[in-house]
């Protein structure tokens, strides 16, 4: 019974989302648990190293013809640049483009690294992603208040609203605005979490199925093909969700800058 429970725990599809401690820092006098080296810390460093390595590899060394790494970076750069320009008009886009581009690259690389089997998904951590989206939302709100002052609150009163409907619409618009802080990150985290959970469950069922006998071993290639198809879809979702997160952040930033 104990061995069965142990196998169930080890093979749990949710185990891939657990934060495990590699190096704990504890003293009898001071609580240093916040400095522990965990899977979250390790994969954050890996993401930063991969992003930095991409820029090193894309260094053209003054060559006329760019390398494939450089071309790939230029495609990503131009895509995000055009997206930010489309959202934020005028000259203001230049101030916020580095932030949106960095945000996109971090989420994109985090999503792609999480597609490696037995790896850790940073963006599937609800606390981290929702905290990130709340910080972005709070920063945009402070920026808008600093730029517009009391006029900022006109954002919650749609133009042309009849006076008797103003209190109701203000409450609705306020709730909608506050919900952005959660929906921005929840959308990303829920998609990555559900996709990885689905692949883990299907992989576990397939592994159990092919171990029954030789006949099921042969038939096991069918669910394996399905898993590979789902994995390809997850790669697409990983890229799309990074772009969606960035474009929504740009859209919210536009609303804060121009109050519409």
From Swiss-Prot:
It is found in: Mitochondrion inner membrane. GO terms for molecular function: proton-transporting ATP synthase activity, rotational mechanism. InterPro entries: ATP_synth_F0_asu, ATP_synth_F0_asu_AS, ATP_synth_F0_asu_bact/mt, F0_ATP_A_sf. It is a multi-pass membrane protein. The chain crosses the membrane at residues 37-57, 96-116, 126-146, 152-172, 192-212, 217-237. The keyword rRNA processing does not apply. GO terms for biological process: proton motive force-driven ATP synthesis. It comes from the Eukaryota. Residues 1-11 form a propeptide. One of its GO terms (cellular component) is proton-transporting ATP synthase complex. Keywords: ATP synthesis, CF(0), Hydrogen ion transport, Ion transport, Membrane, Mitochondrion, Mitochondrion inner membrane, Transmembrane, Transmembrane helix, Transport. F-type ATPases have 2 components, CF(1) - the catalytic core - and CF(0) - the membrane proton channel. CF(1) has five subunits: alpha(3), beta(3), gamma(1), delta(1), epsilon(1). CF(0) has three main subunits: a, b and c. Belongs to the ATPase A chain family. Mitochondrial membrane ATP synthase (F(1)F(0) ATP synthase or Complex V) produces ATP from ADP in the presence of a proton gradient across the membrane which is generated by electron transport complexes of the respiratory chain. F-type ATPases consist of two structural domains, F(1) - containing the extramembraneous catalytic core and F(0) - containing the membrane proton channel, linked together by a central stalk and a peripheral stalk. During catalysis, ATP synthesis in the catalytic domain of F(1) is coupled via a rotary mechanism of the central stalk subunits to proton translocation. This is ATP synthase subunit a. The gene is ATP6.
